[in-house]
Amino acid sequence: ILLILFILLYCFAIFPEISRQKRMKAFHGIMFAHRGLHSKTHGIPENSMSAFRAAVQKNYGIELDLHLTRDGELVVFHDDDLKRVCGRPERPEDLTAAELTKCTLLGTKEHIPLFRDVLALVNDQVPLLVELKIPERNMQICQKAYEMLRSYHGAFLLESFNSEGLYWFRKNAPEVLRGQLSSRLTKEKSDVSWFLRFFVENLWCNFLGRPDFIAYKLTDLPKLTVTLLRIFSGTTIAVWTLRTKDAIHEGKQEYDIQIFENPVKIINK
């Protein structure tokens, strides 16, 4: 009886949204340029307007990251703070949009872009894969992102490591295709509790967001839960971040959506 109960609870915890896999198939086979088609060799920084232009020119989908500024605007930026990319100690959430858009990226003349400007640039030329960065359980970013994306006429997917963010979309914007990001989070140093990271790593938080797809780190696969979801529910699996020819080949052969970080040979294809 206990074993049966555990199996039932496990299935309840990991089960995704399965009714919209036909919609997800439109994204199968798409290669998304991780943070745009950026390259130090070409002087194109990550999550920059030039990286997004390059991806559009090569007809790649674009994966990008969103933070909410102190004054409630959305900017495209990956890290939790500005140290690595901009040489400043603050977090994106600590500054206004005006302050952030003055910050240059990795020593170039490129600046942190506003999400609205990226949407205007892409303008449905290629699909978008939008990751929400949600520190301190601030769901205001979900509302703001939805306000902008519902008036955008292009194809997009939304994803986050934060299952509460996916839950917000499930309840308030169920039409948006949403994905659970994950990896072997328990191996990483983090301020987030080990137990929460364990749950997200094993996709036990799927009961909150009921994701339409799973985006998992390729080098952390195979993973039992991911394998079970593929076999029994046909769940779409995206893999990240593919940086070599072998990884790209594996991603294309074994999984549905590929998120790559552009080797020079790919940029010049």
What are these regions (language model features)?
Residues I1-K269:
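Phosphate-group recognition and catalysis centered on beta-loop-alpha active-site segments
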